Amino acid sequence: MLNLLEHRGILSNTLVVATSDNGMPFPRVKGQAYDDSDHMPLAMQWPEGIRNPGRIVTDYVSFIDFAPTFLELAGITEKQVGMAPIAGRSLNDIFRSAKSGQACAVRDHVIIGRERNDVGRPHDWGYPVRGIVKNDLLYLHNFEPARWPSGNPETGYTDCGGSPTKTETLKTRLSPKQEHRWELSFGLRGAEELYDLRRDPNCLKNVAGDAAFRAETLQLRVQLFRELQAQADPRVLGRGQIFDEYPFASDELRGFYERYLRGEKLDARWINDSDVEPLPLPRTR
């Protein structure tokens, strides 16, 4: 592609973006909200548009910034093309800046979240999470902590695709010395999680309940909910059930949990038969 753009003489004035999907297909990563799930590779090239190259910039950016960037560079607004209001910000402020470090003051954090990734829970419900990353801290709020974060055990933890890694991790549930690996990947979680990404980039130690992080937990919770309210997120406005009521897109898999437990043969090709627990597990933490 780059060779073609160069052949046509437009490479230097073309914004080229290379990024990826969210999360590797491993337990506690794919479909989750931890740093390895949401911290994606991103490379952008635009020789004529990115001023002062060689700078090291620490601003947080998000996928939701792409659309406003493309619209601004094209000279049009979301209203002109019939789009809903955009929560992201154009990256042009970074492209045009001369600053290193924090180039744009409002980019000192990023909001993340998840709802339903796959079927496998009662009523096709998801596992709603909202989070904020700021100052190398990751704060997560789990709105339904009584639900299984990777899908129900009796339907195969369907939010995590089958793999040798998943198989070996599931085996640790019955090992007193290794059970913590199962807990981290598939066990129930509390309503709040906080991780110090400098010391714990793999998000293994939840410090939300530690006295040393009490102030940071409160500050991030307040900022997260304030911004979600400004965005009219139904989860913080008392209407979160609307996400659970959306029908699953696939007719073949809609109502998966109830149909599976009735004995119906369903094509759950993304998990292994051995992923399925023979009986529901107790809901304890």
Explain the meaning of each model-derived region.
Residues 22:
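Active-site metal-binding loops of divalent metal-dependent hydrolases
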Residues 25-28, 34, 119-120, 140-141, ...:
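Short catalytic/ligand-binding loop motif for oxyanion handling, primarily in non-cytosolic enzymes
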Residues 39, 175-192, 197-203, 207-285:
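Long, internal low-complexity/basic segments
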Residues 12-14:
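Short acidic capping loops at alpha-helix termini that bridge into adjacent secondary structure
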Residues 76-193:
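C-terminal cap/loop subdomain of S1 sulfatases and analogous C-terminal strand-loop tails that border
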Residues 2-7, 28-108, 187, 205:
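Substrate-binding rim/cap in mid-to-C-terminal beta-strand-loop elements of soluble/periplasmic
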